[in-house]
Structures are given as structure tokens and as C-alpha cells.
């Protein structure tokens, strides 16, 4: 986004896992009367910075005005590259257990699989977290056919982008990394000429 920002704009990049620090700095600048934009990839309200900003405003009892602008979430970008997989009821589940304990995530996975939701999976894997994706596959296979369609997109919209459509049976968690969005179809989903519908 640098090309859209004027040269005299102060830009602060804190990187991952410093979201709270970034939000604190945003409030410091805003409370001094500056106009501040907190940039979050995808849609700021979906696993992004917006919830933290609102939470911090409440904690600080701040009078700073917040305007949230919607974006395109990673699952939407991935879906468009796969075809049209989100055409019916769906849910989005993050596999990250940093803020949600695994037993809660597992309950959500079971509920999604049993209720036949199309399911987008965020944060499927990280350096220290890999077995959960195998467990997700195992849980979905309890409630779905092994021929259930699964699609995944790695590095959506970037140069290294890759797109794959497979089945639940053939889905290999080893092909997935932290930059991948996985979409598991429902019982009506199908692969038509390489498009996930």
C-alpha cells in the first residue's frame, strides 16, 4: 500500500504478534489529534485488528472515533480462485490456539462437520502446530464422505500462489502451511471442470 501513502505520512510496522502494541501506538497518535489508519490484511473485522481496536477503545474509555472499512478476506480470495465454493451456508474456523483453547476449536470443527457447513479454515498450521490439521481431517471423515470436495489456496493473490482441488480422502495436511486457506465443501459441493462449486 506504500504507493498510496503520501511521503509525509508516518508509517509504523510492528509485524506479527505485536498487534496490541500497534493498537496502543494508534491510540497514542489519535488521542493527540492525528488521523490514524490501522491497516490489517484482508478484512480488519475478520481475524484482523478491528476487534482489538474496539476492545481497546472500551478499555481506555476513549473518545476517539473509529471508522471500520471492509476488505476482502482471505477465504473470499481463496474461494474466487477455486471457483464458487461458498454458495450456501458456511462457517470460518481458525485453527490457531493462541486465543482459543484446542478443545473449543475441536468442538467447533465437529459442529461444522456434523451440520454440513462449507468450512473455511484459517491458520491451518504453524511451526509449532501441525497435528491439529490431521485431527480436523479425521473429524470431518466421521461425518462426511471421503469423496467430499476440499480445496486449498496457498499464498492467495501473491506470486507464489498455488490452487488445488482434491477430496477429503486425498487431502494431505503435509501440503499445507500457515499461508494456506483450506475450504471444505458440504455434501452438495462438487468439482466441475476444475471448479469447486
Task: Give the residues covered by each predicted segment.
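Class I S-adenosyl-L-methionine
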Residues: 1-66, 77, 172
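Short acidic loop-to-helix transition motifs that present clustered carboxylates
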Residues: 18-22, 74, 98, 157-158
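Class I SAM-dependent methyltransferase SAM-binding "motif I" and its flanking Rossmann-like core
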Residues: 45-115
Amino acid at each position: 500500500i506504500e504507493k498510496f501513502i503520501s511521503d509525509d505520512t508516518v508509517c509504523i510496522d510492528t509485524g506479527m504478534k505485536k498487534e496490541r502494541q500497534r493498537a496502543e501506538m494508534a491510540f497514542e497518535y489519535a488521542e493527540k489529534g492525528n488521523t490514524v489508519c490501522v491497516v490489517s490484511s484482508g478484512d480488519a473485522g475478520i481475524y484482523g485488528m478491528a476487534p482489538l481496536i474496539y476492545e481497546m477503545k472500551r478499555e481506555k474509555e476513549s473518545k476517539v472515533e473509529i471508522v471500520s472499512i471492509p476488505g476482502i478476506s482471505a477465504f473470499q480470495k481463496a474461494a474466487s480462485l477455486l471457483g464458487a465454493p461458498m454458495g450456501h451456508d458456511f462457517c470460518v474456523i481458525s485453527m490457531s490456539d493462541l486465543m482459543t483453547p484446542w478443545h473449543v476449536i475441536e468442538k467447533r470443527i465437529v459442529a461444522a462437520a456434523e451440520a454440513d457447513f462449507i468450512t473455511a479454515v484459517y491458520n491451518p498450521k504453524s511451526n509449532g502446530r501441525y497435528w491439529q490439521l490431521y485431527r480436523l481431517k479425521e473429524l470431518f471423515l466421521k461425518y462426511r464422505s471421503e469423496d467430499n470436495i476440499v480445496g486449498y489456496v496457498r499464498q492467495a493473490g501473491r506470486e507464489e500462489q498455488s490452487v488445488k482441488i482434491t477430496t477429503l480422502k486425498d487431502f494431505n495436511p503435509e501440503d499445507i502451511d500457515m499461508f494456506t486457506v483450506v475450504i471444505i465443501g458440504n455434501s452438495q459441493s462438487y468439482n466441475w471442470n476444475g471448479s469447486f462449486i
